[in-house]
Curated annotation (Swiss-Prot):
Stored PROSITE patterns: B3
Primary localisation category: nucleus
InterPro entries registered for this protein in UniProt: B3_DNA-bd, DNA-bd_pseudobarrel_sf, LEC2-like
A Pfam family this chain is assigned to: B3
Record GO terms (molecular function): DNA-binding transcription factor activity; transcription cis-regulatory region binding
Protein's name according to its UniProt entry: B3 domain-containing protein LFL1
Cellular localisation: Nucleus
Length: 402
C-alpha cells in the first residue's frame, strides 16, 4: 500500500521522453514487477536501447494503458526469461536419422538439416564403398556445405561444332612453284622502316618491269604459310647511274612471321596461275631454296642454237682447254705474282737533267733564252760520278737532277 501511495503522489513529468519516468523511484532495473498488492505499474523495458527506441506515451496523471508490443524480431532475453528457461526441463532430442540402405537410389529424399547436408555428386571411392555388399552404414559425421554444380541446365556441345584446326602447310611445300628470288634479311630489312631491299640481278630478271616515271607498282603475293594475300609496293631508287629495287610495306609481314636478323624470304613464281608467292624461312632451317641463274632463265626464253665449227679466229674454244693454261705457274717458294714480275725484262732509266728540257738545240739557235746563257760554262763544270750518276759539282743556275 505504501508503494501505491507513492505512485499516486508522484507528479507527472510532461517533458520527459521516456516511459521510464512512469515507474516509481527506487525500482531495481532488473525487469521484475514490484512486490505489492494491487500494483498496476507497467513492466519495465528490456534494456536501455529498448527504452530509447520505444514509442512515446502521452503524459497524464494516471498510468496509461500501453498497447501490446509487436514482435519485431529476436530480442535479448530478460533475466526472468533466462531464469524460467533454466528451471524448465530441456526438450527431448530429435529422433536419429536412419542410415540409407545400399540398394536405395540416388533420387531418395535426403535430410534437410545442416548436419546431414553433403555434396550432390559423390566421388567414385564413396560410391564404390556404398555399392559394395558389406552392409557398412553411411557415416553421420556433419560435412561442410558445398556448392551445387549446374549439370542439368547445361547441355554438351555437339561434336560437329568442334571443328579441328586447319593444318598449317609446310614452308617447303613448293609443288608447282619456281624459286625466283631469295634474300637474307639484314638489320635495315627488319627495322621499323618496313621495306626490304631486293637483289638487283634477280629483280630485273624475274619481277615485273617498272615503266612508270615514279618507278612504283603494286605487287600482290600469296603467303605460302597461310594463303593470305599481301599487297606490297615494288619500286626502285636511283643509285648514281644504277637502280636499287625495294619492296615496301613489308612491316606487317615481318611481324606476322616473327622474322629476325639472319632469316630469309623466298619469292616463288606460280607459272600455272600466273601469280607470285612469298615464303619465310628461319635461319636454322637447313633446307635452302635453289635460285636459278639468270642465264638459265634467258636460255629458256631464247634458246641458243649450236655454233658451226669454222677454222678461223671466231671458232669457239675447245672445252678441254682451261684458263689455267694461260697463267704462268709459280715455283714452290714464290708466289704467282712474284714470278710474273721477275719474268719481265729490266728497262734502263736514262740520266736526264731538268735543264736539258730548256736546251734542245745548239747555242747559236738559243740566243734569246736567258736561262741557257751560260750553257757552255755549265757543261764544262758538270762532272758526274760513275756509280751514282749524279753531278759532283752542281751548277746553281741549273735545275734539279732526275
Amino acid at each position: 500500500m505504501r508503494g501505491e501511495e507513492r505512485w499516486q503522489e508522484q507528479p507527472a513529468l510532461a517533458s520527459h521522453p521516456s516511459r521510464a519516468t512512469l515507474r516509481p523511484r527506487g525500482w531495481p532495473r532488473l525487469g521484475l514487477a514490484p512486490t505489492g498488492v494491487g500494483s498496476s505499474c507497467p513492466p519495465a523495458p528490456a534494456s536501455e536501447l529498448a527504452r530509447h527506441l520505444a514509442r512515446r506515451a502521452p503524459v497524464s496523471a494516471s498510468p496509461p494503458v500501453l498497447p501490446p508490443i509487436k514482435d519485431q524480431g529476436a530480442r535479448p532475453p530478460t533475466l526472468a526469461a533466462s531464469a524460467a528457461a533454466a528451471s524448465s526441463p530441456p526438450p527431448p532430442p530429435p529422433p536419429p536419422i536412419p542410415p540409407l540402405p545400399p540398394s536405395t537410389s540416388t533420387s531418395a529424399a535426403r535430410p534437410t538439416d545442416m548436419a546431414g547436408v553433403t555434396s550432390k555428386r559423390r566421388s567414385s571411392s564413396a560410391s564404390t564403398s556404398s555399392s559394395s555388399g558389406d552392409g557398412a552404414a553411411v557415416s553421420d559425421r556433419p560435412r561442410g556445405v558445398t556448392r551445387k554444380r549446374r549439370s542439368g541446365g547445361r547441355c554438351p556441345r555437339p561434336a560437329a561444332s568442334l571443328r579441328p584446326a586447319a593444318p598449317r602447310p609446310s614452308s617447303h611445300h613448293t609443288a608447282g612453284l619456281r624459286v625466283i628470288l631469295q634474300k637474307e634479311l639484314r638489320y635495315s630489312d627488319v627495322s621499323q622502316l618496313g621495306r626490304i631491299v631486293l637483289p638487283k640481278k634477280e629483280a630485273e630478271a624475274y619481277l615485273p618491269i617498272l615503266t612508270s616515271k615514279d618507278g612504283k607498282k603494286s605487287l600482290c603475293m600469296h603467303d605460302l604459310q597461310n594463303a593470305q594475300l599481301w599487297t606490297f609496293k615494288y619500286r626502285y631508287w636511283p643509285n648514281n647511274k644504277s637502280r636499287m629495287y625495294v619492296l615496301e610495306n613489308t612491316g606487317d609481314y615481318v611481324r606476322t612471321h616473327d622474322l629476325q636478323l639472319g632469316d630469309s624470304i623466298v619469292i616463288y613464281k606460280d607459272d600455272e596461275n600466273n601469280r607470285f608467292v612469298i615464303g619465310a624461312k628461319k635461319a636454322g632451317d637447313q633446307q635452302a631454296a635453289t635460285v636459278p641463274q639468270v642465264d638459265e632463265h634467258i636460255s629458256t626464253l631464247f634458246p641458243i642454237f649450236p655454233i658451226a665449227q669454222v677454222d678461223d679466229y671466231l671458232s669457239p674454244m675447245a672445252p678441254q682447254v682451261d684458263i689455267s693454261a694461260f697463267v704462268p705457274h709459280a715455283d714452290e717458294n714464290h708466289e704467282i705474282f712474284d714470278g710474273i714480275l721477275n719474268s719481265l725484262p729490266e728497262i734502263p732509266v736514262a740520266n736526264v737533267r731538268y735543264s736539258d728540257f730548256f736546251d734542245p738545240f745548239d747555242d747559236g739557235m738559243d740566243m734569246a733564252n736567258t736561262l741557257n746563257a751560260n750553257a757552255n760554262q755549265s757543261a764544262s763544270l758538270h762532272v758526274t760520278d760513275d756509280k751514282s750518276g749524279h753531278s759532283l759539282i752542281p751548277n746553281p743556275k741549273s735545275g734539279p737532277h732526275m
